[in-house]
Amino acid sequence: MGLALAFKCANQGLSVILLESGGFGDRGNAEARLGSAEILTPHHAALEAIRCQGIGGTSRLWGGRCVALDDIDFEKRDHVANSGWPIPHAEIANYYGEALTFLGCGIDAAHAKNAERTAQAEIATDMPEYWSAEPDLRRQHGARLRNSANIRVYTLCTVSGIRLDSDGARVAALVVKSGDRSFEVTARSYVLAGGGLENARLLLLAQRDWPHKFGGPNGPLGRYYCGHLSGYLAAIRFNQQSFAKSLWYRKSSDGSHLRHRLAPSPDAQRKHALLNTVFWLDSFSIGDPAHGSGALSMLYLGLALLGLYPRIGNGLAPSPTEPRSRGLRRHLSNVVRDPRLLSSMFSVTWQFSKRRLGQRAFALMNPGERYLLRYHAEQVPTSESRVFLADDDRGGTPKLCVDFRFQPQDIDSVVKSHEVLDDWLQREKIGRLDYLTDADRQSEAVLNQALDGYHQIGVTRMADDPKSGVVDRDCRVHDMANLFVAGSSVFPTAGQANPTLPAVALALRLGDHLRRIASTL
């Protein structure tokens, strides 16, 4: 987010100082310079998996998926506590094209109008996601950053504190550490863009000196921490391959990739009290005979016989079934029972050869018309899910404690969303779901797969009322004249989308706001 914002401001004639804890090189050791954290829940990813120092930040860990939020995400929903944004979706959507271009999704994606879920259909089938051709933003924009006349980059410089002026109404300076040195940086406006956890840590540290700032000790700062639930609860079997193909990866005219997903409509969400959820197709691993395809089993057996599968085949796609159910006999059964084996083998071999030669490696379409169904679901924001500073200040920087919680509503909504989708598939004679878990264990299966910490949403949430949020509709910290926050930590709700695209769009919007107010600060 910081890189997008820096370019936006610089292109409009503003002078920018970019403070980066890492450098231009390979991924740094975040723990060495950033503060430590204690994860209090098994449902939150480890710090080394979610933090990355260096130009481009966590884009080095990012897969490249770009997805827009939906209009319903911005509504106050009766069945979703603490929902509603103070701005409409259009305020962000106006910047999606520019954000897609910055993220490397190609010209076609940048000019595409985001599809809206129709109220008439219970399940939408045209929800697009775009893929960046180069997710690592350091590689995309590093040279441009070095050559920018309006951006001064200071690497290996970690912001360790925020110093306010005498009445606490403005930021006077940022406290910066670089190696053994400590110094201050001053500017007219300051933007925290260090990721949700680090943004929250810096504000919580400032709150220790100013206890009534940012909503006070029991206010919204650090609370409403949420992300997404993702995993597999079912496979999907189609009655015809053409429908699966409409949901599969394809190239646009400029060479970028996109695909479409399945999603309950806004009316269906309201009717069934669902959190926003989407589904997409994944291939079974070719080593898992649960795919039901003789051609995929033949490909696996051939690679295994030649000793190549462990090197180039293993991990082509996920496999949620038990290893003991993946024996040779089941693969041979797939081969014998496949009436379209020869034609399917040609298709699979062609896909596999393209997959190995292409720049981006996507999974294989299944001639057996059975796919894993991946869900990606919203988490309800709750104040009990939070981050806070430990009382122990050992090491100089207080440890950040992460108490990230899923709620029963989150789990129930995932299960119910599958039921709504299955009813629609069968009613429309499109296909059906094959559950991977017995009905009485489905909630347990969803909870066991529930893990986030990558998206870091809500801990500096946006609201018009300082009692309900940390920043206002312009991403300015309440009661602070010149302090702003960029990133998904300002989202009041998570929606179904991974937050990269809307967070960049919101950062670009902030850049325009900073230009408008530059002469007043």
Give residue ranges: language-model regions.
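N-terminal Rossmann-fold NAD(P) dinucleotide-binding loop
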Residues: G2-L3
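Mid-to-C-terminal "cap/lid" subdomains and adjacent gly/pro-rich loops that border
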Residues: A193, R201-P367, S519
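A generic secondary-structure signal for well-formed alpha-helical elements
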Residues: G13-V16, G23-N29, L69, Y96-I107, ...
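A glycine-rich dinucleotide-binding beta-alpha-beta segment and adjacent secondary-structure elements
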Residues: Y154-D167, Q351-S385, T397-A494, T500
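N-terminal FAD cofactor-binding segment of flavoenzymes
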Residues: K8-L69, I87-L103
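Glycine-rich loop(s) and the adjacent beta-strand/alpha-helix scaffold that form part
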Residues: N11, G22-G25, A45-E48, I162, ...
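Short, solvent-exposed loop/turn and secondary-structure capping segments
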Residues: R27-E31, T58, G64, D73-F74, ...
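Conserved redox-cofactor binding core of oxidoreductases
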Residues: P42, L47, D78-A173, L447-Q449
